Amino acid sequence: METLASRIDPTSPAFAENEAAQRALVADLRQRLAVAALGGPEKSRQRHLARGKLLPRDRIDTLLDPGSPFLEIAPLAANGLYQDASPGAGIIAGIGLVHGRPVLVLSNDATVKGGTYYPMTVKKHLRAQEIALENRLPCVYLVDSGGAFLPMQDDVFPDRDHFGRIFSNQARMSAAKIPQIASVMGSCTAGGAYVPAMSDETVIVRNQGTQAICGIPAADIRAWL
C-alpha cells in the first residue's frame, strides 16, 4: 500500500493562519460549553443551594461511579435561542456508569426557569430517550421540573416530537422491559410529575420532592381570564 505523506508545512504562513483560526474556534466552543455548564444565573443557583439542594451536575457526579466518564449529549442545545435564557435547554442528558453498568441520565436544571421545558428541552429529552431505546439503556431521571414553559406552550405541544411523546417513549421502554428509575428532587408539576409517575421506581426526597398535576395559581381560573 502506498504511503500517503503529509505535504503540510507547519512553518508556512498559511499553516499559521489556519492554526490560529482553529484555535480561536476551539476557544469559543470551550467558552460556550463552560457557560452552558453553569446553568441558570448566579441568583438562581444561589437560591437553589439555599434550599439545601445540590446543583444538577453535582447530583450526576454523586450518582455515577467515582472517577467514571460521563458522555454528555447535546450540551449546547438551545444555544443562542430564547435570548439565551435556557442554557443547555435546561436539562442535562448523558450516558454514565452506575455500579459499572451504562445508564442514560436525564437531570432537570431547576436553576433554568424552574426546570421547565422549552421546545428545545423537549427535543433534547426525546433524543436521549431514543438513544436509550436503541441501546436498551436503563434510564435514571433526576426530576426537578415545573413541566412545560407555559409562555411557549404553543410551541411545546403541536408537532410529532412534542411533549407528550416523552410519555409515549416511557410506555414503550416499560413494554420493552428497559428499567426507568426516577428521583423527585423538587416541586414537580404537570409533565414534571408524569415522568416519575410512569417510572418503574420513584424515590421522593424528604422535605424537598413533591408531585402535582398543577399548582394553585394554574388551577385558579381567574388567572386565565
Enumerate the predicted regions with their spans.
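Conserved catalytic cores of soluble enzyme domains
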Residues: 143-225
